[in-house]
Amino acid sequence: LQKSKYKVCGYVTDVEGNMDYFNKYVKISKILEWTCEKKNRLKFKKNDSIFIYGGDTQDRGDSDIRFVNILLKFKEDYPERVIFIIGNRDANKLRIPSEISEKYSNYQNFLKKYDNYPYWEDKSVRITLRKYLKDNNYDLNIKNRLKYIVERTMGNKDGFEKRRVELSIILKKNINNISDNDVISSFLNSVLPKPKNITQSNDNYMLKYLMQGQLVHIFGEHIFVHGAINEKNIGKIPKNKNTIEDIHIWAKEINNWFHKELKEYMKNPKDGGITKKRKAHNIINYAVPGYNKDITIVYADNLKNGNGVHINKNVIEHLNKYGIKNIITGHKPHGDCPLVIRDKNLTAISADTSYSNINYLKNIKDDKYYNDKRGKAVSEVLLYSNGDIRVHGILADNSKYGYIIKKNKKSPSSSDYIGLQLNNNYWVKNFKNNKYLISFGKGFDIDEKWVNLQELKKLLKKL
């Protein structure tokens, strides 16, 4: 392994345009802080650290543009020390130009093309453009097509109007003076090589993020992807039947593949509609579920029906062979603190906590956070060049926590149990006040309970 000149990496993921959450993260962060009270520019606290953003910058909050611009400025100030991982909510924005630019002469023929779209969704839950327009009594026009794309197929509820609000804030204009065309231009400009009407919307901030992003990054013994590394995708490059053995070469080659495809897209971003002819098709296809028997690292996960699963033994051996001992990901939420999955030779951490507000999930409306899926919870994962991992943050009940997983521990510690699966299939997720948080996921529901060491040891005994 090439020795890094940096000691520690700070990691957060899946902010999804939620500046309230990112502010909470900066407040607890050990490695970065705001430069001033305006909270629009970041700096490192020390010279020995780097920062990795784990992907998914967009869609769920009200600050998509502002959040990415903060990240871009941070990378401009520290180009070597700030790394962007590309998530599905980042890559899928390349769909917008070709889908809203497509012309049609026959209404019914145009809708018919969309009757099997989105192709990555099961027919039982798929909402087609035809159904969306009918259910909402909408006309077929660019505005409603964009609303369908953003709000229905990208999961950005009220995304069109949220963008209008954000533009009014950025441009310092009355919201009534932000037109539908301004909003359309905003989404379109975000991924165009040559954005237009910038003064009334924004520039190509998302394209800039993608141009500077990576699908894979390696820091010491830690490897970062948005989704997961498994037996289906390790060493795989899209459109290439060969498997790359060396993990470091694979990381380089899959990043090269992405940027080659992105350059092709930039030559002609608007043509092709929803067909395979559009230049971004390969990237779009790679960042959706079910791609080519799930060889994607962007949309994979370490869950089965919402609960953690052990990392494949062959994957562990393969990663270990090339000096990798930890996989750091986001993508799929799991409670109000990161999910840790440990084998004696590898630790996998999934740090997406975007569904951490239990009251929201249960729709309890007497909690002031009921309309916020995140609530009070926030976390930071710190990865050290010596292989150690530190996780700290605030839980949904507003209590603080923190633990360290040491690579070369000389004596037992309370964190030794974190990341183990119990005989009732619960995972040990946290430690606080001499008790352990154990958790079982089912879909987006999480059953959690605190147990003492004696209770934990009983659950660790083989049946």
Predicted regions and their residues:
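Feature recognizes metal-dependent phosphohydrolase scaffolds
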Residues: 1-463
